[in-house]
Regions:
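An alpha-helical appendage that flanks or caps ligand/catalytic pockets
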Residues: 119-147, 188-294, 325-326
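Flexible, glycine-rich active-site loops centered on histidine and acidic residues
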Residues: 1-13, 75-138, 178
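Conserved, mostly hydrophobic/aromatic
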Residues: 27, 31, 39, 58, ...
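Active-site mouth loops of central-metabolism enzymes
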Residues: 3-18, 72-79, 152-162, 270-279
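Hydrophobic faces of well-ordered beta-strands that scaffold small-molecule active sites
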Residues: 1, 35-37, 67-69, 97-101, ...
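A conserved active-site cap/scaffold subdomain adjacent to cofactor or substrate pockets
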Residues: 168-187, 192-193
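Short, acidic/polar
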Residues: 14-26, 163-169, 281-288
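N-terminal beta1-alpha1-beta2 module of alpha/beta enzyme domains
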Residues: 1-61, 65
Length: 327
């Protein structure tokens, strides 16, 4: 599960974060493998900007599920600080922490510069900073003058996240697991996965390539209900295109009538990797997707306005994956 801590127009930020906790607790109980949270900034509808802080909150309320960043936008941060933050999390919750890294700012250009004045230079140094972060977390860093405490010597899985050929190239070259952001930028997914597998350079930690596809999933008792619930997600993406990033709105009927032709095309392209329907429909659609992509793991994000409906969608999606895995 990837959670963006999406703020709805009837909910405070505090309540939103506690709803994220509720979702994580349910995923933990149902047997989901991971619960990741994403770093975004200066977005009124997303409350997950302090990602490491939230991960500690979520980890403290769950027992088994892996907790991770999906992802930390590394150019926004010092690699040493990230090593210390995630080293702290791993020390508190051993064997449960994932560290996903992205190259984008998770915001607009002006905000990126406010976060870190040399962001664009750091973005170009992303491969170098990934290596530096790996070094800080390695037990072999003990001979260097700059060391991460906590962090050094801890086995924290590091993932490369992305939505382009650049990210797949880096993940393949470094022999790292790779997660693709198909939930908002699916255009290059198939090419990126193929390149990653064909050019994978085995590492000691990861002798074989490993892929995650993150997709949108909205499930309900009927496909008609699921499509209605999904209208809030469509409006969210429409607002992004219009540069009007307000909190998520309640679902509406005929949501596509709110868009002009170009807006509809853009939204449908961004959301083309979405699975919306009842249990049977999503089982068939998602199974075909897995067979085609040969992806190792599916991660879902579920943008639904009503909290109870979102939790129920999470329950249905667990049954969907159980059905697929049983085939």
């Amino acid at each position: 599960m990837l959670d963006l801590a999406v703020v709805t127009d009837d909910c405070s930020i505090g309540d939103t974060l506690y709803k994220s906790k509720d979702l994580a607790v349910l995923c933990d109980r149902l047997g989901y493998e991971r619960f990741w949270m994403a770093e975004h900034h200066n977005m009124e509808h997303i409350a997950s900007s302090a990602t490491a802080v939230l991960l500690g909150f979520i980890a403290g309320h769950t027992k088994r599920i892996r907790i991770g960043s999906g992802g930390v936008m590394l150019p926004n941060h010092s690699p040493l600080v990230i090593a210390e933050q995630f080293g702290t999390l791993e020390s508190l919750y051993p064997g449960r922490i994932d560290l996903g890294l992205g190259r984008a700012p998770g915001t607009d250009g002006e905000t990126a510069m406010a976060i870190r004045s040399d962001f664009y230079a750091q973005s170009q140094r992303f491969p170098e900073n990934v290596s530096k972060l790996q070094e800080y977390l390695s037990s072999e860093n003990c001979k260097n003058r700059v060391r991460a405490f906590p962090g050094e010597g801890l086995e924290i899985p590091i993932w490369i996240l992305g939505s382009s050929m650049d990210s797949s190239t880096l993940a393949a070259a470094y022999g790292m697991p790779y997660a693709f952001a198909g939930h908002f930028a699916p255009k290059m997914m198939f090419e990126a996965f193929d390149f990653y597998r064909e050019n994978y350079n085995p590492s000691e930690e990861h002798p074989k390539p490993y892929t995650i596809a993150c997709v949108n999933a909205i499930a309900a008792e009927t496909t008609e209900e699921a499509e209605f619930l999904a209208s809030s997600m469509y409006m969210n993406f429409l607002n992004i295109i219009r540069n009007d990033r307000k909190p998520m709105q309640a679902p509406v009927k005929n949501v596509k009538s709110l868009m002009n032709t170009m807006e509809r095309y853009q939204v449908e392209q961004m959301l083309s990797c979405s699975f919306i329907g009842d249990e049977d429909k999503i089982t068939e659609d998602l199974n075909r997707f897995i067979e085609y992509t040969k992806v190792d793991e599916i991660m879902i994000t579920c943008q639904i306005y009503d909290h109870k409906s979102r939790l129920h969608s999470c329950e249905i999606m667990k049954r969907v994956m159980d059905n697929i895995n049983a085939r």
